[in-house]
C-alpha cells in the first residue's frame, strides 16, 4: 500500500519512461489526410525522427504547436503526428487553422498505440533514432528550453551516428 501512495504523489513528468533506450513500439496506422494510406513505424528505420502525440481537444497541444511548426520549417528533423483519440474531421480542421508541422499525421482513434508508447496524456513527444530506439520522451508540451537544451542537441548527435 505504501508503494501505491508514493506512486500517487509522483509527478508523471518526472517519472522516467521504461521505453527510453528500448525499441519503439511497432505500429501500422492510417494517415489522417489520406486514410487509404498506411504508415508503419518501420518505414522510418534509417532516420532520426520525432513522434508527437497530439489532439485537437488538447489545450497544451495548441501551446506547443507554434514551436513544432518552427522546428518543421527548420528541416532539422521530420516530425510525425500521432493524432490521439480524436475525430478525423476536427483534427484536419485544427491543423488547417494552426498549421501542419507533420511529415505525416497518423490516426490512433482507439488509443492503443498511445498505450503501447506509455502515453500519460497529450501532448507527448518522442525522439527515435535510426535503429528505431526511443532516445527521449517529452511529457507535456515541447518548450523552447527543452528544444534548445535537450531535443535538438540530441537529434543532431543521433544524426551523426551510423
Where are these regions (language model features)?
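A short beta-strand-turn-helix
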Residues: 27-50
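N-terminal targeting signals for export/organelle localization
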Residues: 1-30, 162
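Short pre-active-site segment immediately N-terminal to redox-active cysteine/selenocysteine motifs
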Residues: 23, 47-49, 53-57, 121
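Structural microenvironment flanking redox-active thiols in thiol-disulfide oxidoreductases
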Residues: 62-99, 109-116
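Thiol/disulfide oxidoreductase modules built on the thioredoxin-like
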Residues: 96-101, 108-159
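A generic structural signal for alpha->beta connector loops
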Residues: 26, 76-77, 102-103
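Hydrophobic beta-strand core positions in alpha/beta domains
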Residues: 50-52, 81, 127
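Short gly/ser/thr-rich secondary-structure transition/capping motifs
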Residues: 9-10, 30-37, 105-108
Amino acid at each position: 500500500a505504501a508503494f501505491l501512495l508514493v506512486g500517487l504523489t509522483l509527478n508523471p513528468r518526472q517519472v522516467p519512461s521504461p521505453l527510453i533506450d528500448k525499441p519503439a513500439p511497432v505500429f501500422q496506422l492510417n494517415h489522417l489526410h489520406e486514410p487509404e494510406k498506411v504508415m508503419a513505424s518501420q518505414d522510418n528505420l534509417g532516420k532520426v525522427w520525432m513522434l508527437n502525440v497530439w489532439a485537437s481537444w488538447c489545450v497544451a497541444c495548441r501551446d506547443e504547436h507554434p514551436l513544432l511548426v518552427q522546428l518543421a520549417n527548420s528541416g532539422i528533423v521530420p516530425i510525425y503526428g500521432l493524432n490521439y483519440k480524436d475525430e478525423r474531421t476536427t483534427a484536419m480542421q485544427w491543423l488547417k487553422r494552426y498549421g501542419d508541422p507533420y511529415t505525416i499525421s497518423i490516426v490512433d482513434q482507439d488509443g492503443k498505440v498511445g498505450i503501447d508508447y506509455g502515453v500519460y496524456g497529450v501532448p507527448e513527444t518522442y525522439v527515435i533514432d535510426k535503429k528505431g530506439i526511443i532516445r527521449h520522451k517529452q511529457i507535456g508540451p515541447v518548450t523552447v528550453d527543452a528544444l534548445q537544451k535537450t531535443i535538438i542537441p540530441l537529434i543532431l548527435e543521433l544524426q551523426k551516428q551510423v
